[in-house]
Amino acid sequence: METGILVVIFISCLLVSFTGYTIYTAFGQPSKQLRDPFEEHED
């Protein structure tokens, strides 16, 4: 394979992995540890 194709595949895999991790952090098990500043604010 050409070097350019390998670089594109590597960057694509990196982007998909990062997106999956951020979705897991936002909606998965670790989301219970995130704080909500709107919940902490009292009127």
Swiss-Prot record:
Bilayer topology: Single-pass membrane protein
Subcellular location as annotated: Plastid, Chloroplast thylakoid membrane
Gene Ontology cellular component terms for the protein in this record: chloroplast thylakoid membrane
Bilayer-crossing regions: 4-24
Alphabetical keyword list: Chloroplast, Membrane, Plastid, Thylakoid, Transmembrane, Transmembrane helix
Keyword NADP: no
A Pfam family the protein falls into: PsbN
Database matches in InterPro entries: PSII_PsbN
One GO biological process term: photosynthesis
Tagged with keyword Transmembrane helix: yes
Primary location: plastid
Family of the protein in this entry: Belongs to the PsbN family.
Record function comment: May play a role in photosystem I and II biogenesis.
Protein name: Protein PsbN
Organism of provenance: Chaetosphaeridium globosum (Charophycean green alga)
Gene: psbN
